[in-house]
Structures are given as structure tokens and as C-alpha cells.
């Protein structure tokens, strides 16, 4: 068993001051580490409650034992303002009280590098760290639309800033951005609720000869179409789209939806190209890795896996397979089935399941139907459904050696994937020919899961 994993970490970064943290990873076969949310924790009266529900690693839990339960995130670096000249987006600052511990952390990173660990930065949706939303011209901090070219310029400047102060880092993981892909109302990733019509989005559409408002209207019309189904319509759709050419008539009858996908592909690509070329212009040897969603709905999220090899060094599709909460694969599939059923009460269960399979390009194992998704998945799910997603990744990216899927146990409080499922997942990954993955994240790893991960490491 010889997978080469990347371990992604979250706060507290303070645990990294202890060489035992790095030694533990090395002993477990982890020689690549991506440090996400690179912030110090400051105890406050009202702030983020930590540790989170998902933390399980003893080293993480012990850090919080003699502390309060609310914290403020403090960026670990003070910015070099000259790097941000000309930008209306401004970086956060660090107070002087953290100067000493920053020096200690920098030394710890250097020792880790000397131990043979490769270190990677992490950017989450182009705001770089959880406390680092860039401030706009009014001083307010918050998410900025990635169709604003300055968002990429800010990311490039932030990357240079970190590398200047922490030169032992050799690459960066870009997490997103993504357009939405869910259909369940009220979900974070509900594609029908995502209707950004800012000037940057409208300008991007006009540059393609498109009217953004017409695309948004087409999305609303498609939702209405999904709410007016019957068994005869579904049977006809399944019959007429069975072959490769069969779907052509459907797409030609929905030209604005095809234009919407083109818009999503183009704007995500333009943003990632700006990131990639901007970083490489200043740091040509720096490795740039970029995430996407799993192939079944990567098109909805705006990522064209075959094209991305031109503007990423490694591709990191998210193989998030849990069932209990967003953005797990089984959770999304269940939402499609349940939402289509709620919208169309007269539809048979058979029609709903078959339609979901056709839309997402999946087939449920006979021994693990949708009704069982809340329980642990059998090996057949990982061999068939997860295995197909992996095979799609390999085919679409065209280079298995540049493929590093994300895997995780859960997100936002849902039931975790069980240790045996992790074993089935890693075995399927290995059997597919994929030899690397990135694990999200260190803090959630129980001893039973740790044993499984180390079984498969080099």
C-alpha cells in the first residue's frame, strides 16, 4: 500500500510549534502538509467557539484544555503594503503582541522543512484565510466576487507576501471558487438561489456576447420545468437521452442553459488563469494546485477538468462522499431525489431515482439504494460509485500523476464516514491508479481513522 497523502491542517497553528506534531505526521507517512486558515487564536469574550464539534485529535483537544471557549482569528503575518499598491482590496494586519510567536512558528516551519516535509499555503475561495477577507474601499471586510479581476490580484499579492516571510513554503492549494450545484431549497449550494448580478458578472457576460439577466431567467425557467414533471415526461427524457447524441435535442431546446454553463466555465477559468499566471510570473517554481467538485457535478460548478491542466500544476477534485450534511456526495444525491419527489408528488420513486441517475451520471449499487444512504456504505458503493468518479477524474484530467483528490470524513456536523469506509475508499483509490490524495483535515482524525490512513501511506 503506497499512497502519498497531503495532510491539510486547521487552527490552532500553535500546535505546530512542537516538533512532536511534525514527527507524528512523518511517522504516519505524511510528508506533505497544507496549512489552511493560517491564523493565531486569541481568547476573547465573544468570538468563534472552539474547539468545534468535529475536533478529535488529542493534540488539538489538549491545546484548548486550559483555555476559554471563544477566540478571535489573528492573521499570522503583517502585510507588506507595497505589494498591494493599486488595489482597492486591502489585507488584514496583525498586532505586535504576536511578533514573538510568529518568529517561533517560522522557525518551526523551517525545522519541518529540514525534516523533509513539503509545505503548502491554502487559499479558501480567494480570501486566503478566514480572518483575511480583503477590505474594500469603505473598510468593510467580506467576500468579493471572483469576476472582479482585483480578487485574483489580491490573491497573488497575498501569496507573494506569505512566501517572502515564509520562504520554506513551496506551493499553494486554491480551494474553489465554485458556482452552485444543489437543487434543494435553502441549501448553501442551491444553484437556483445563486444569482449574482454585480457589475463584474454582467461585464463578463457581455464580453461573451451574453445577457446575464437572460441566463438567470433561464435558470428560473429550468427550475419551474423540474417542478412540472410526470412519469411520461421522465420516461421520454430517459429514452431520448440514452445515447451520446440523444441529449443534443434537449440542449438545443435550452440554449440559455448551455450559455449559462459556458459563462460558468469561462469565468471560473479566467479567474484561475489570473491566479496561476500571476503567481507563476513572480514565483515560477511555486506549485499551484486547484480544487473542484467531483465530476458528477463539476459542470454545474463551473470547472472544466480537461482544460484545467493548462492553468494548474495539480488538480484536486473533491471526493466528499458523506451523507449527513453539505457538501457530501450522498447528501447531494439524496437532496436531488427528495427535492424532485417533493416538487412532483405524482412521480413514481422509480422515475425520480432514474432521473437523478441520468442527471448526475451515476448508478446506485443494488445493495445500497438511496433509502440506505444515511447508514454506512458497503464496499460496493466505493467500488462502483466512488470508483466511477475516480475513473472520470482520470479520464477528464488526462494525467493521473497530476491528480490529488480531496477526501474527508464529514463537514458541518453530519455523521462521519466510518473507518471501514475510509479503508474501502483508499483501497478503491489505490486500485484506480491514483496514488495521491489530500485529507481534510488533521483535527478530525480519530485513532481508528489514523490507523487506516497510515496503512495506506508510503
Residue ranges and their predicted role:
Residues 4-15, 80-102, 138-153, 254-269, ...:
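The substrate-binding groove and active-site-proximal loops of carbohydrate-active enzymes
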Residues 45-73, 127-146, 174-247, 309, ...:
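Aromatic- and acidic-residue-enriched segments that line the glycan-binding/catalytic groove
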Residues 129-132, 244-257, 286-295, 347-381, ...:
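Active-site clefts of carbohydrate-active enzymes
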Residues 131-139, 181-183, 285-329, 414-432:
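Substrate-binding cleft/loops of secretory-pathway carbohydrate-active enzymes
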Amino acid at each position: 500500500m503506497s499512497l502519498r497523502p497531503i495532510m491539510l491542517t486547521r487552527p490552532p497553528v500553535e500546535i505546530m510549534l512542537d516538533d512532536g506534531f511534525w514527527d507524528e505526521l512523518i511517522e504516519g507517512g505524511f510528508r506533505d502538509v497544507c496549512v489552511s486558515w493560517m491564523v493565531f487564536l486569541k481568547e476573547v469574550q465573544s468570538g468563534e467557539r472552539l474547539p468545534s464539534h468535529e475536533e478529535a485529535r488529542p493534540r488539538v483537544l489538549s491545546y484548548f484544555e486550559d483555555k476559554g471557549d471563544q477566540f478571535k482569528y489573528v492573521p499570522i503575518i503583517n502585510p507588506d503594503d507595497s505589494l498591494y499598491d493599486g488595489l482597492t482590496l486591502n489585507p488584514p494586519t496583525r498586532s505586535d503582541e504576536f511578533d514573538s510567536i510568529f518568529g517561533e512558528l517560522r522557525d518551526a516551519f523551517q525545522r519541518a522543512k529540514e525534516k523533509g516535509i513539503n509545505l503548502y499555503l491554502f487559499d479558501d475561495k480567494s480570501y486566503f484565510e478566514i480572518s483575511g477577507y480583503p477590505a474594500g474601499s469603505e473598510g468593510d471586510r467580506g467576500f468579493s466576487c471572483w469576476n472582479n479581476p482585483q480578487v485574483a490580484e489580491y490573491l497573488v499579492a497575498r501569496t507573494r507576501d506569505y512566501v517572502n516571510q515564509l520562504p520554506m513554503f513551496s506551493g499553494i492549494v486554491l480551494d474553489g471558487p465554485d458556482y452552485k450545484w444543489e437543487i434543494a431549497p435553502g441549501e448553501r449550494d442551491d444553484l437556483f438561489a445563486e444569482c449574482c448580478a454585480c457589475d463584474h458578472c454582467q461585464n463578463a457576460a457581455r464580453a461573451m456576447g451574453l445577457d446575464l439577466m437572460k441566463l438567470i431567467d433561464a435558470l428560473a425557467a429550468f427550475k419551474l420545468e423540474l417542478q412540472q414533471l410526470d412519469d411520461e415526461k421522465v420516461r421520454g427524457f430517459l429514452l431520448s437521452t440514452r445515447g451520446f447524441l440523444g441529449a443534443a435535442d434537449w440542449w438545443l431546446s435550452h440554449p440559455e442553459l448551455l450559455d449559462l454553463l459556458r459563462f460558468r466555465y469561462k469565468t471560473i477559468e479566467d479567474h484561475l488563469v489570473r491566479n496561476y499566471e500571476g503567481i507563476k510570473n513572480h514565483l515560477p517554481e511555486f506549485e499551484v494546485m486547484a480544487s473542484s467538485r467531483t465530476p458528477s457535478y463539476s459542470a454545474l460548478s463551473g470547472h472544466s477538468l480537461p482544460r484545467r491542466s493548462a492553468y494548474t500544476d495539480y488538480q484536486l477534485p473533491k471526493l466528499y462522499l458523506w451523507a449527513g450534511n453539505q457538501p457530501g456526495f450522498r447528501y447531494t444525491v439524496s437532496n436531488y431525489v427528495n427535492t424532485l419527489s417533493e416538487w412532483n408528488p405524482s412521480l413514481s420513486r422509480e422515475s425520480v431515482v432514474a432521473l437523478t441517475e441520468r442527471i448526475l451520471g451515476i448508478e446506485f449499487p443494488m445493495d445500497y439504494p438511496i433509502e440506505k444512504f444515511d447508514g454506512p456504505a458497503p464496499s460496493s458503493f466505493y467500488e462502483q460509485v466512488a470508483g466511477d468518479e475516480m475513473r472520470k477524474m482520470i479520464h477528464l484530467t488526462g494525467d493521473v500523476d497530476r491528480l490529488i483528490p480531496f477526501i474527508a470524513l464529514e463537514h458541518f456536523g453530519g455523521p462521519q464516514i466510518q473507518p471501514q469506509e475510509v479503508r474501502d475508499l483508499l483501497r478503491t483509490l489505490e486500485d484506480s491508479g491514483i496514488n495521491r490524495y489530500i485529507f481534510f483535515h488533521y483535527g478530525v482524525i480519530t485513532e481508528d481513522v489514523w490507523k487506516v490512513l497510515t496503512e495506506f501511506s508510503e
